[in-house]
Structures are given as structure tokens and as C-alpha cells.
């Protein structure tokens, strides 16, 4: 999880298509899932506002949501990368600090 402030922007990590944008999955709150290719998905969880819709094409660095606490008790971004359906360490895909 990545801590932050409510309303802080969340950006797409890579180009892709939004395959899910909603809040029907228990415990995830407002969730966005982007399919980048046949192997990779990224998930952005607990968003305050979602700025994209399902089937929308997004570009790397595009603002897709704002940070929030939907489905949890504190403001945070739960960020996942999945490779062939399996969760992998997302730090490999984030910019160096």
C-alpha cells in the first residue's frame, strides 16, 4: 500500500484499456483495473474519485483517479501488478525515487 492524502492524483503506470471501474468487489472500494497487454494488468484500489470508465484507452502517466479510503479505514492506494494472473512485486514497475 502507498500512503498519501485524500485527493492526491493517481496515474496509470502504462498504456492500456480500463477493463473494470467500479466498487462491486467487497473490500476494494472504488477499483480500477487496466489491461496493458495479454500478460499484464494493474489495479488501483480504494480511490476517492474515478476519472476513467470501462473500455476507455489510457496513456502512461494519465490521471485516472484520486486517492481515498473507500473500502478501508485510512487514505491509501493499494496498487497491484499482475503478470499472467499472478500478483508480482509492483516496486519493479514504479519510478525510482
Swiss-Prot record:
Keyword Cell membrane tagged:
yes
Keywords of the record, alphabetical order, are: Cell inner membrane, Cell membrane, Lipoprotein, Membrane
Listed GO MF terms: metalloendopeptidase activity
State if Cytoplasm is listed as a keyword: no
| Gene3D superfamilies for this protein | Glucose Permease (Domain IIA) (2.70.70.10)
Where does the record place it?
Cell inner membrane
Pfam family for this entry, one: Peptidase_M23
Give the record's GO CC terms.
Answer: cell division site; cell outer membrane; plasma membrane
Q: Which InterPro entries does the record cross-reference, listed alphabetically?
A: Cell_wall_metabolism_enzyme, Dup_hybrid_motif, Peptidase_M23
Membrane topology note: Lipid-anchor
Q: Which family does it belong to?
A: Belongs to the E.coli NlpD/Haemophilus LppB family.
User: What is this protein identified as?
Assistant: Lipoprotein NlpD
Name the encoding gene, please.
Answer: nlpD
